[in-house]
Regions:
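Terminal disorder- and signal-encoded targeting elements
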Residues: 1-342
Length: 342
């Protein structure tokens, strides 16, 4: 199975709100070996519980997909509080219209793009400069990529003023265990693959007629193309060992957020009948740990067990009463969690 396609996304201009500060850097650090250099990692192929050395999988790198989003595609996904979406391509009078512009309509990986929100109205625009959003077009719809967590101050853009985000996109450092994208000016989002993307910000106008105002938001968006290979899904440097026990793959990993926590096992079980799975793309998977490790080892396995630690309650944030499940590359898996002895 070519681990590139779908996994279920989080919609909205900022998936989760948090009260604390979030910095502009990625969590975790690049490390480990390049997955294409032939270095081996312990894994089990000779029998149950027998670790052997096998080469790391070398993913197939393909070109930027030709699929182009139609102009009438629903956007942003999952937002019922949006009254109006203003695309930069639809602005005929930039000098007289509030809009989000870009420095380029296309870039190559790794690359940089600047996006500027210009308030050309005569009143304040109420917004949050942390609450930008990057979307990827894949599988016939827009999918939210970043950020997953958003600081929640209320900010304003005064009449005649502008605000610029400089966004760096990359496809390197794939073995970094955890990725975080945040910031109000300088933003890095990695890893991403080639394709069509959209950057968006939202807010509402001071003294607008609709009330409550925050339930009648305007979204300003710009679409651009990223040229580069498709993103492969590979394990991170947090993985210390793997072994195979029949149809089950066991992955041992160090939690990139620290080892202080409850010893636990993240369980991914193949189940095509699982109800209501989230459908994700690879760019989203890299931002969900340890799901990323489990899916990277799911080829040919009925179950993947990631043995690590977690500081989250419930374990790994898994609410098993909700029967969580994901779909990736056309295959569906149930998600579970078990406490284990340290």
């Amino acid at each position: 199975m070519h681990r590139r396609r779908f996994l279920a996304g989080v919609a909205g201009l900022g998936a989760f709100g948090v009260a604390g500060c979030i910095d502009d850097t990625s969590a975790g650090a690049p490390g480990g070996t390049d997955p294409t250099d032939g270095v081996s990692t312990p894994t089990g192929t000779d029998g149950p519980g027998t670790p052997t050395a096998t080469p790391l999988r070398t993913p197939t790198m393909t070109a930027t997909p030709p699929e182009t989003p139609p102009h009438d595609a629903p956007f942003p996904p999952g937002r019922e509080d949006v009254d109006r979406v203003v695309w930069y391509r639809e602005v005929s009078d930039p000098a007289g219209t509030t809009h989000l512009s870009y420095s380029t309509s296309s870039l190559s990986l790794p690359g940089e793009i600047s996006l500027t929100l210009q308030n050309n109205a005569d009143r304040q625009f109420m917004t949050n400069f942390y609450d930008w959003a990057l979307y990827r077009w894949e599988g016939g719809r827009w999918r939210h990529v970043a950020p997953l967590f958003v600081n929640q101050p209320l900010m304003t853009l005064e009449p005649g003023e502008s605000h610029t985000w400089t966004v760096t996109l990359g496809d390197e450092n794939l073995e970094t265990p955890a990725f975080r994208a945040s910031g109000t000016h300088e933003v890095t989002v990695e890893p991403v693959g080639g394709g069509h993307y959209a950057f968006a910000v939202d807010g509402w106008w001071e003294d607008q007629d609709e009330t409550p105002a925050h339930e009648h938001e305007a979204v300003y968006a710009a679409r651009f193309e990223v040229e580069g290979p498709q993103l492969p899904l590979v394990p991170s440097s947090a993985v210390t060992a793997t072994r195979r026990e029949g149809d089950t793959v066991v992955v041992e990993a160090e939690n990139p957020r620290g080892s202080d926590g409850t010893p636990a096992t993240y369980v991914l079980t193949r189940d095509d009948a699982a109800p209501g799975p989230r459908e994700l793309v690879t760019e989203q998977v890299y931002r969900e740990w340890p799901l990323r490790e489990a899916l990277a080892h799911a080829d040919g396995a009925s179950e993947v067990r990631v043995e690590t630690t977690t500081g989250i309650t419930p374990l790994f944030g898994v609410h098993e009463e909700d029967n969580p499940a994901v779909t990736y590359d056309g295959e569906t898996f149930r998600i579970g969690a078990e406490e284990r002895e340290g």
